[in-house]
């Protein structure tokens, strides 16, 4: 009886083949990750544009239905017919009511010029002094006589986002 075992020839991957696969995955990641990050931020900005539109429409509707064109209408979200989720209202301490979400705070100006959406670095704390990556601004049509939608930024990341939003009708102002 023969107790010797014969090994069947097994062939695995060579080190070079494994390195090539890792290199290809690295290159794909380096190309895809910035595009993915940009797409996620553009989606966040689109959500902010939707919320600013809802706030502007609620204020404009309140003005038209009440016939009152006064800063008191702008100063109190209780006057508006609006339902927003994912955040909370608070007093900004300087400029009017503020709606705070995880990524943005929205400021409705008592000077009746419009609604700003400020993209916080990190999680928003509800502090008016939170540093922003970029700012979106939507004017009240009844005040300005036209619809305006602007994006401002002091950071390179924010400038790139502002430029990518021009396809949505946002005017970039450096």
List the model feature ranges, each with a label.
Residues 8-9, 23, 53, 66, ...:
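A ubiquitous, low-specificity "background" feature that marks scattered single residues
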